[in-house]
């Protein structure tokens, strides 16, 4: 069985997080509950996970030399990517040198961009996906749109939180969607994926955890997106037995191909009993924030256990639950939050304020959580709590 040492001593079990956002913050808390020494790394100071870690470093994680220098200095037992935008070639090298990357360096590399994971799912594993084409130039992109027809979706192959993503309904959308995709990609201008639109009933995240004892699934998480960015999520999403079985089959295939240990967020489109693979994150998923109130072990606790090789004998879902994000728009380096008493006045509600050091434009700064007798009631309660929070910039 795994052994965990004493933090800040020669026996410490050191975990280094690449990325220090709100999801990483919860992972740090869970790792510290299990006695780990945690180092948080990100491109800006005072990031949420840094505020609860033992130490932190500020570097560009796309700079392979800087990333290697920090890892060689800290000598972590586990390297845990929390975001996609990392010098994954360096992670591959470090893994070959004996470091443990969660879940694997290959998983981080394949999921860093939409092309790697789409080709794995559709072409290697033969899983159902939307029809798709990749394009490097405007001419190729226009040809892809013409081939797939309207409506269709365009996304940069490297972006997160819906940045650069558009739904094209007709010819008038073609040029502006291309321009928006070129602005929204993490690596600047470049390659896009054009996908045929699936007329789905709903979309889910199937949180799938690969751990010492095998693979375990959480109850499906339903969610609502705006411009590709999560606004609210709920668990359990009602589904047919056939759709659940097919979702688990697809998630098992994808996570099995990526390998390693840890929690994965597998995104799927559902129509009746039919299921299509969309994307996968080899780490906790933003829509899974609902598990902070909906499960006895949150997605973050599950990730921590899986990383450390600890057993997950069961996951208990505690009833209809929902999350609603607290979005803030404007500019500030010292936002403050009030009316929290009203937000927490109803039973079975909770808040997480992420502690992000600044707002520039629109930013997710917290989440409201709620449980109730039905999904509809839980969603309404979470939205009331989120809307009650007042923000001063």
Curated annotation (Swiss-Prot):
Record's keyword annotation contains Magnesium: yes
Cellular component aspect of the GO annotation: cytosol
MF terms in GO: ATP binding; magnesium ion binding; phosphoribosylglycinamide formyltransferase 2 activity; phosphoribosylglycinamide formyltransferase activity
Binding-site residues, ATP: 114, 155, 160-165, 195-198, 203
Top-level EC class as recorded in UniProt: ligase
This protein's record includes keyword Ion transport: no
Keywords tagged on the record: ATP-binding, Ligase, Magnesium, Metal-binding, Nucleotide-binding, Purine biosynthesis
BP term (GO), one: 'de novo' IMP biosynthetic process
Residues that hold N(1)-(5-phospho-beta-D-ribosyl)glycinamide according to the record: 22-23, 82, 286, 356, 363-364
UniProt-listed Enzyme Commission number(s): 6.3.1.21
Functional description taken from the UniProt entry: Involved in the de novo purine biosynthesis. Catalyzes the transfer of formate to 5-phospho-ribosyl-glycinamide (GAR), producing 5-phospho-ribosyl-N-formylglycinamide (FGAR). Formate is provided by PurU via hydrolysis of 10-formyl-tetrahydrofolate.
TM region(s), chain numbering: none
Pathway the protein contributes to: Purine metabolism; IMP biosynthesis via de novo pathway; N(2)-formyl-N(1)-(5-phospho-D-ribosyl)glycinamide from N(1)-(5-phospho-D-ribosyl)glycinamide (formate route): step 1/1
Gene designation per UniProt: purT
The family this protein is said to belong to: Belongs to the PurK/PurT family.
Family annotation (SUPFAM superfamilies): Glutathione synthetase ATP-binding domain-like, PreATP-grasp domain
Official protein name in the record: Formate-dependent phosphoribosylglycinamide formyltransferase
Residues in ATP-grasp domain copies: 119-308
Recorded catalytic activity of this chain's protein: N(1)-(5-phospho-beta-D-ribosyl)glycinamide + formate + ATP = N(2)-formyl-N(1)-(5-phospho-beta-D-ribosyl)glycinamide + ADP + phosphate + H(+)
Binding site for Mg(2+): 267, 279
Assembly with partners or alone: Homodimer.
